[in-house]
Amino acid sequence: MSRFFANGSDSESESSEEEVQAPNFNKASAFQFSDDEEEVKRVVRSTKEKRYENLTSIIKTIRNHKKIKDIPNTLSSFEDLTRAYTKALPVISKEENGITPRFYIRCLAELEDFINEIWEDREGRRNLSKNNTKSLGTLRQKVRKYIKDFEEDLSRFREAPDQESEAEDEEAHVSDAGEAADDSYAGFKKEASVTAPKIAKSAPAKSVPADDEDSDDSIDWDSDSESETESSEDENQYQNMRERFLKRSTEKGEDKGDDDKRKDKRKEQKLKIRKRAEDDEDGEWETVVKGHVVEKPKMFEKDAEIDIPLVLAKLVEIMSARGKKRTDRRLQIDLLFELRDISDQHNLGVPVSVKIHFNIISAIFDYNQKISEPMKMEHWALLLEVMQSMMKLLLANADISISESVAEEHEEYITAPYYIRGCPLAAVERLDDEFTKLLKECDPHSNDYVSRLKDEMNVVKTIELVLQYFEQCGNPNERCRIYLRKIEHLYYKFDPEVLKKKRGELPATTATSVDVMDKLCKFIYAKDDTDRIRTRAILAHIYHHAMHDNWFQARDLVLMSHLQDNIDAADPATRILYNRMMANLGLCAFRQENVKDAHHCLVDLMVTGKPKELLAQGLLPQRQHERSAEQEKIEKQRQMPFHMHINLELLECVYLVSAMLLEIPYIAAHEFDARRRMISKTFYQQLRSSERQSLVGPPESMREHVVAAAKAMRCGNWQACANFIVNKKMNTKVWDLFYESDRVREMLVKFIKEESLRTYLFTYSNVYTSISIPSLAQMYELPVPKVHSIISKMIINEELMASLDDPSETVVMHRSEPSRLQALAMQFVDKVTNLVDVNEKVFDMKQGNFFQRGNMGNRGDRGYNRNQNNQGGNWGGQRRDNRNQRNRNQRGHHKNQQQQQQQQVQTIDEE
């Protein structure tokens, strides 16, 4: 309607006439074929344009999918993109000399960053649906595999992304490739080509200073009016509908010229802005920041006399804002540092400086509002520095006493002895907890974790300073608390000097970590009056002994402390430490050749199937639906840092090997025992599942190696068993993780030989009448005295029915045990007897005594008896007597059946 009223006519009649005259065009002409049709040229696009247009459209689709995090569609679009790029390779090699287009490299880089961002966000990844999670893993693998061919291009792109110029290049590619498609509506082409330069003119004008605002407004108004007139001209131009939608040949030269003009104008505007900024820097001009400027509050007046009461009053004023809603916590820390500098400049004394230090520590702790989240690294470094500085001041001045038992009104800063209210022990405990949170927050496989772990030296140094202070002026309870903090940083660390000292390579006076642990733990045993600190100290002490192969000391501590009786009543952190202690104790027993004890230590952890959770080394994703978000958050806070983890595969391997060395000889000894018990349920299940498989390939995983070794041991083949347990793959995965791994491997081979010998004797004792001891020693590569000792133990324990003939060095087998056929027959008789008994009981329960009466319950007899009883007047008593007689007959019949069955069993045994 705007074009009819554009002239602003004075009378309504004129406007109505214009409205009537406007549609005077012949309607049929809109569908007529133009005589000039031959002059209209169709657009012929090159192969490059088609391929590039296809690539850019797919890239645009991928970006849209990334915005809404639609991972399955992103995956399908990425596959389409790779196929489209493969089709475009001939064009790229011909037109671009084999150089991959920048916009394609940009797309790959953005896609890689997008995947890494989602993958590192563990919280968000857990909340993804099953389809998104599966698609994310597939997309990540495909992208990582695909971009290997573009590593050099990606590295060059990441070094100099050139975002602005790259965007322009991409726009140019898109415009070149899709020029014909965009011009399909020829009526809008002219409008776009006319208005684009005017928008480009008006856009830079916004960056010009305020003096040119009026001119900018006038330019904008002119452009609006011009665009309206152009649109009306375009609508009047295309009188033929077919002509309107015909594709025309594009004037690429003019469009490129317009693009070059736009780029030149943008560069000119940027140069002008840079020159003005340089001119401003030369002068005294300052850039005004939007919003009001908050001035930093003044500490003291100019003429104020700085003394201790004034500084303390200012300190109270600053700390009074602590915990309030609108408090600027960063400004509060800055003010406290400034106050400390003022105190040092005016020599107000060490007590005032210590008090300010302590308040700075409290302010840094308050900076992070969420306790569950770690603090920033800049605050962490500042906290360590201030904490160590305060403790050095306290150690250098013995007349300063800082304690939480000192009331604020009793603080003394002027005359010695000085008394300050505060608790450095609570501060160092909080610092230690913050360090643990920092470690748990970052990726354990990154360099960031290693750099943060280096701060443990500073944390331990700070704990040492606090420990020295409380050894001078602390009570026993405070010393126990700080001793426990030092123990928790020491108990899991291996000290090779302990084993060297055992072997005599170091003098006996050398101080080791075991001596330090003994000193700290014994003080806690004697002085602590809380069960928790003493319990944790005992657990850490046992762990440290077990780590350094002090098996008997660790075992005695466990037995004397009776921890296993009351550990269920302890807090979760203590129970986690108990589980860690039992795991390490089992590894120690295994290294010291106590296979049975190792199995007993590890069975409670491994039989549950979730040692990862019990050791606080991660959460199982299968049980995610069983816990709420709050429970998951609490469990994450209890997790151990990565450098304190125990290798779960090593733990499981030790448990399975120990179970194999115990279970296989036991199975061979009780092969026909129906009441045979399982020593290890987990190992038994692994063995049975392998036996149920119709086709078993060569072992690959650790479990498959142990199961294959167990099958070889059942046949007495110790060499195959040893090869399955000790090989290159198992050494890399498990055995090389042990200290002195060669000694552990030798111990394993020795145990495999001995248990294979026992299994062989159990399995084939019914085949031999006698067997030579030297031949057994040669078969299993064991010394003859060792073989003699093993067989003697088996005979003494009544495991093997045989006798030793020393002159001939043979083992004479006794035929006291039933043969295989006899054992199977006895099992069959037992099962048949049980089946008969069960069937009789079921029959009696269902039918009662009805079918056991005379004549199968004949009604005529019962009527006759009833008439006789009625005549005698004692019908009820006679019925009771008959029932009792029938019951006696049944019991006698059942006894006769049992006697007959026993006789049958005896005859079978005699045969």
UniProtKB/Swiss-Prot annotation:
Boundaries of every PCI domain copy: 642-818
Modified residues (Phosphoserine): 34, 165, 175, 184
Compositional bias per record (Acidic residues), positions renumbered to this chain: 11-20, 162-171, 210-236
Biased composition range(s): Basic and acidic residues: 241-271
Main location: cytoplasm
Assembly with partners or alone: Component of the eukaryotic translation initiation factor 3 (eIF-3) complex. The eIF-3 complex interacts with pix.
Protein name, per record: Eukaryotic translation initiation factor 3 subunit C
Phylogenetic classification of the source organism: Eukaryota, Metazoa, Ecdysozoa, Arthropoda, Hexapoda
Gene name of the encoded protein: eIF3c
